[in-house]
From Swiss-Prot:
The keyword Cell membrane applies. Disruption phenotype: Strongly reduces the production of acetylaranotin. The chain crosses the membrane at residues 6-26, 45-65, 67-87, 115-135, 155-175, 182-202, 227-247, 260-280, 287-307, 321-341, 349-369, 420-440. This is MFS acetylaranotin efflux transporter ataA. GO terms for cellular component: plasma membrane. It comes from Aspergillus terreus (strain NIH 2624 / FGSC A1156). Its main location: membrane. InterPro entries: MFS_trans_sf. It is found in: Cell membrane. It comes from the Eukaryota. It is a multi-pass membrane protein. One of its GO terms (molecular function) is transmembrane transporter activity. Glycans are attached at N252. Efflux pump that may provide the dual role of acetylaranotin export and self-protection by allowing the fungus to evade the harmful effect of its own acetylaranotin production.
């Protein structure tokens, strides 16, 4: 029981980082004066997480599980320490990458404290795991260093990561730093496409030794579950990364209070995850819950696009509950569906692929949402408030607008800011809606006993 408890405590730390970053982002943009880097704060964390989900999944097969897990915790702790001490936005993004190797009393220290708090918790977990975590009946596969290196699919890594980085750079710079027709942006999109094609060719050639084995990903239940997970998670992360900004920039909430104001979303997610789990267990068929989840989530996200500067508590609480009920019901369904149809030997790989898709969808679509937000903010300010520099608004961050914008322009700036955030949420509505295609292709056939 103690070893199970220690593992769950550590999982709580990791989950905390997935959500606390979103709440701390407005404060981080103030500290580093880099509103344009919001997309990178989420995408860098999620991108490297999705990559190392698959790599660590393979490492567990070649080395003792306990020591691989402990090594990952130590790397995570180092990343948390350097994130808390990051002096610039660029350094923070780089250090976020380090902290993703594992699958506050005062508002002004929230951004650093969010990461430093991991250190004592991690130290306690390491001590407990050293004492009580015993993994029985695990025999690591013996392999030479050369064989191990090859099985990590290095060619897949060196084609996939640069491809996604090129794509994120194009989305980040397009329309703001450079025009969409600029040669740099076009070159980045072309290079991303070429590298992704190379990655797919490598996966096909390597088969079961690939990062994403074609034999498994092409199975109908896995393919459609992966599609659903990528779109559904992308929509969720798009909401959760920009909702705290809305509370802090539009409602003047502190970072701590904005976290509290997001509780309706989080609590409804928890409750309806149990509802979905119980429903699937009772009926033996996850497909109806896919449809219900997409309808609820799309409806909730759609209602959130009606947010205005003066939207009151009943609406932003109620809409979050509706959205959270759909997300909580749907976010775990792909894993349940895949585990119900895959042979036992393939379940770990299938689960790893879906976890990969979850964070991959977040990495890509948070960056897309940032491109939408930044472009709408810039064009909106130029059109509606010509006396205010878009560059100044982006440099000052999300919560210090009143320090550089005079009172006569503040109302108009908030309206433009609100419209830019809402525009990013339209992307979430579209993703939730299209995710229903995953349910259409889902197999309801359960694996034989």
């Amino acid at each position: 029981m103690r070893r199970v408890t220690s593992v769950y405590v550590w999982l709580t730390v990791v989950v905390k980082d997935n959500t606390i970053i979103a709440t701390a982002i407005p404060r981080i943009t103030d500290q580093f004066k880099a509103l344009e880097d919001v997309g990178w704060y989420g995408s860098s964390y999620l991108l490297v997480t999705c990559m190392f989900q698959l790599i660590f999944g393979k490492l567990y097969g070649y080395f003792p599980i306990k020591w691989v897990f402990l090594a990952a915790i130590i790397i995570f702790e180092i990343g948390s320490a350097v994130c808390g001490a990051a002096p610039t936005s660029d350094a923070f993004i780089l250090e976020m990458v380090v902290s993703t190797y594992l699958p506050e009393p005062f508002d002004h220290v929230l951004s650093a404290g969010s990461f430093y708090i991991n250190l004592p918790i991690g130290a306690v977990v390491i001590v407990v795991l050293l004492q009580f975590l015993h993994v029985p009946n695990t025999v690591p596969v013996e392999a030479s260093s050369k064989t191990l290196f090859q099985h990590m699919d290095p060619l897949g890594v060196v084609t996939f990561l640069p491809a996604i980085v090129c794509l994120l750079l194009a989305l980040q710079w397009g329309g703001t730093t450079f025009p969409w027709a600029n040669g740099r942006i076009i070159a980045l999109f072309v290079l991303a496409g070429v590298l992704l094609i190379a990655f797919l060719a490598i996966q096909r050639k390597r088969q079961d030794n690939a990062m994403v084995p074609p034999r498994i990903i092409t199975m109908h239940p896995v393919a459609f579950s992966s599609l659903f997970m990528t779109l559904f998670a992308g929509a969720y992360f798009t909401i959760i990364y920009y909702l705290p900004i809305w509370f802090q920039a539009i409602k003047n909430a502190s970072a701590v209070n904005s976290g509290i104001m997001c509780l309706p979303l989080m609590l409804s997610m928890v409750i309806f995850s149990f509802v979905a789990g119980g429903g699937v267990t009772a009926t033996g068929n996850p497909v109806p819950f896919f449809y219900i989840a997409t309808v609820l989530a799309a409806a909730g996200a759609g209602l959130m696009t009606t947010f205005e500067v003066h939207t009151g508590h009943p609406k932003w609480i109620g809409y979050q509950v509706l959205l959270g009920s759909g997300v909580g019901m749907g976010i775990q369904l792909p894993i349940i569906a895949v585990q119900a149809v895959l042979p036992a030997a393939d379940i770990p790989v299938g689960t790893a692929i879906l976890t990969f898709c979850q964070t991959f969808g977040g990495a890509i679509f948070v960056s897309v949402a940032q491109a939408v937000f930044a472009n709408r903010l810039q064009t909106g300010l130029l059109r509606a408030v010509p006396g205010v520099s878009p560059g100044l608004v982006q440099e000052v961050g999300a919560t210090n607008l009143d320090t550089v914008i005079d009172a006569q322009h503040m109302g108009a700036v908030k309206v433009v800011y609100n419209d830019a955030l809402v525009s990013a949420w339209y992307l979430a509505v579209a993703l939730f809606s299209v995710a229903v295609l995953g349910a259409v292709g889902m197999s309801t056939k359960r694996k034989s006993a």
